[in-house]
Amino acid sequence: MPFTRWKGVRNNTDYKLLIRMKIYQLYRRQYLNLSLQEAWEFFSSPYNLNDITPEFFHVSIISKVPEKIYAGLMLNYQMKAVFGIPMTWLSEISHCDEPKRFVYEQRIGPFKFWSHEVCLTETQNGIVLEDIMFYAMPIGWLGQLINTVLIASKLERIFDTRRDYLDSKWGLKP
């Protein structure tokens, strides 16, 4: 996936900054027993975020949002991500290709860079859900250390919780 397709990369200077950053990737794939339309209805609703996020995160949407996402939608969240410290996260739905994929990108938040693509692919038995995340930590080598010690495992835990929740509702073995 080329970086230049991300909305946050506006010119060659931005692209060069991305190249110098330590970019981390997290990829998840899950098979679910529901139709493409049912999957889109669930994942495109900002109100389902609480169901698929661990309770320790205390996520709440603090901006007024519609029932379904669309390209350009700004979502403002409050969460307690690290040591129970409240933080605000503003993200934008930068791409929306109903009912197959959407991308949200951090505009204000704890990361130097964050892009999360959610892809839904119809199969004979349901759908394949794919999450493709790229992120970079702020504050140079210290951010890289914090990622190694704390953040990477927290992100894994978030997506493990989501996987377990979705499996309990619509789990399907490949």
Annotate each PLM feature.
Residues Q25-Y27, P86-L90, K112-H116:
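Short, surface-exposed coil-to-beta transition loops
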Residues Y15-Y70:
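Hydrophobic ligand-binding cavity/cleft-lining segments
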Residues Q106-R157:
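Beta-strand/loop substructures that line and gate deep hydrophobic ligand-binding cavities in soluble
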Residues I61-I108, V128, T161-P174:
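Glycine-rich portal/gate segments that line the openings of hydrophobic small-molecule binding cavities
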Residues L32-L34, M79-F83, H95, P110, ...:
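Beta-strand elements of well-folded, non-transmembrane domains
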